[in-house]
């Protein structure tokens, strides 16, 4: 079995964001732990009329971004190696619950 890591994320100040990243290592030489994040989950906790900006975006290999329409209660499940970001908050407050499933390395 694996373990689950959970984090409550708050975007409360204008400009709060998360730069482009992956939730796990993709280069085998960087894999120093016995397990790593395999599956990522983001659950929206705030109605999208309560904030502007702070949108989750996925980045494709060609650099294009996908912005899923997100509202309170929506969940996004994706492989932890997928690049993504959260754009800067403009106004309001956004809360999300972020979870990662840890397991053995992909083969």
Predicted regions and their residues:
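Catalytic core of non-heme Fe(II) oxygenases with the double-stranded beta-helix
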Residues: 1-107
């Amino acid at each position: 079995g694996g373990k689950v890591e959970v984090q409550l994320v708050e975007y409360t100040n204008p400009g709060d964001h998360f730069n482009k990243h992956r939730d796990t290592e993709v280069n085998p030489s960087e894999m120093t732990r016995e397990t790593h994040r395999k599956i990522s989950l983001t659950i929206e906790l705030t109605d999208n009329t309560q904030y502007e900006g702070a949108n989750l975006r996925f980045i494709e290999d060609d650099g294009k971004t996908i912005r899923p329409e997100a509202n309170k209660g929506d969940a996004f499940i994706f492989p932890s190696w997928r690049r993504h970001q959260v754009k800067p908050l403009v106004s309001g407050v956004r809360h999300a619950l972020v979870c990662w499933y840890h397991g053995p390395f992909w083969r």
